[in-house]
Amino acid sequence: MDRNSTLIKLRPEVPKAKITEGISEIEEFQNITVRPIIKFQNDFILALFSNHARGYQKNWGSLSNEKKTFFIENSTNKNQNLKNTFIGCIIGFFTPDELNFYFDNKSELNRRIVQIIKQRILSKLFEI
């Protein structure tokens, strides 16, 4: 089996990621490619963020949910190294054709990738 087939087979289904008529090419790519990869990488993403949080907030476990939420928002919006790490752990699972599409739409897709990851981390706040 070649790399492309393997990468695509690894991706879980995301029932909420609908493909409907009239959606943009970027939104279709997000739903067909990005969301399944993020779902596949979920445990890795949460572990990565947990390590990040504990590195910056030694008392992470005792912080209020409000302070944790603020830290998550702040980290995913302003910490360029963290954002680049998240983006890298997603685009590493792209096929060459998907990577070419990504490079053509890099700015918008980076924004969407980080936004989806931020929402996923916020929804798993109690697991971190």
Question: What would you call each of these model-derived segments?
Answer:
Residues 1-35:
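N-terminal leader/targeting peptides and immediately adjacent processing regions
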Residues 9, 16-20, 56-57, 61-62, ...:
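Short, flexible segments with low predicted structural confidence
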Residues 60-110:
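Amphipathic protein-protein interaction modules
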